[in-house]
Each structure stands twice: as C-alpha cells, then as structure tokens.
Amino acid sequence: MNGPPAQPPIGLQLSRTARVVTNAFERAMAQAGGSASAWQVLVLVRAGQWGTQAEMAEAMGITGATLTHHLNALEDQGLVRRWREASNRRVQQAALTEAGEELFDRLREVAMRHDQRLRSTLSEKEVEQLGRLLEKVRVGVGS
C-alpha cells in the first residue's frame, strides 16, 4: 500500500489558495468602495457584450436571481441604469452611469494592482506555466 502523498491534495491547495486570493481581492475592492461581484457586473455592463441577463449570469457563474440582486443594488446606488429594449420588451439593456464609470475606473486600478501583486512573486515563465496548469486541471475536472 502506498503512503500518503508528499504534498497536500491538489484540491485542498487550490481551495486554500483561491480563498486567500479572493479574500485579498474583496478587501482591496471594499477599501475602494466596491466589491468583487460589483466589479464583475460593472465590467460586463461596460463591455455591453452580453445579450440577456441569463447570458450575463452564466458568464459570471451565478444564478439569474443573484445577478438581478446585484443589478438592483447597483441601480439603487446610481451606478447602473437599465431599460427595456424597444423592439423586444423582454430584453433589458444596461449601461453605467457617470458614477458607475467613476467606480469602474477606481476598481479597475484596484484589480490591476491585485493582479500585479499576484504576479510579483512569479517569473513570466512561471505565470505562463501556472496558467497552463490551471487550465489543464479545469479541463481534467470537466468544466
């Protein structure tokens, strides 16, 4: 019988790392007046490349109800405005307000600094290798 692996299980390492990285990102976003979920919504709304809220929710990996909650909150804060498409009332469009654009710019800086921080301990070759390895794990798990 084989003994225990020399390293902790990969899933545990990935989970711990994801939690640490996510918590650091959330703290940085909160200090700038936002959140990771608000940032994701602002990015997608600003890009304007999503067709329906269902497609947007899928792109974020959340449910439609959760997305609606986020959009409602951003709209209530005056960061996003929504309207029904004239040719198809079932389709809702969204855009950032001026305040939403200002928050987007602030959070983009935070996101870029966070990414630089993550990359700071790795060489360019290691960053590329990490990306390939993470993709390999994702494909191997089936998602």
Name each model-derived stretch.
Residues 44, 59, 77:
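Residues within the alpha-helical elements of helix-turn-helix
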Residues 38-42:
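Short alpha-helical "packing" element that flanks the helix-turn-helix/winged-helix DNA-binding module
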Residues 1-6, 124-143:
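C-terminal regulatory/oligomerization modules of transcriptional regulators
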Residues 63-66:
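Helix-turn-helix DNA-binding motif, specifically the short coil turn and the N-cap/start of the second
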Residues 43, 69, 132:
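DNA-binding alpha-helical recognition surfaces that contact promoter or target DNA
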Residues 1-32, 98:
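N-terminal leader segment of winged-helix/HTH proteins
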Residues 22, 50, 54, 72-135:
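Charged, amphipathic alpha-helical coiled-coil/dimerization segments
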Residues 45-48, 137:
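Short helix-capping/turn signature of helix-turn-helix
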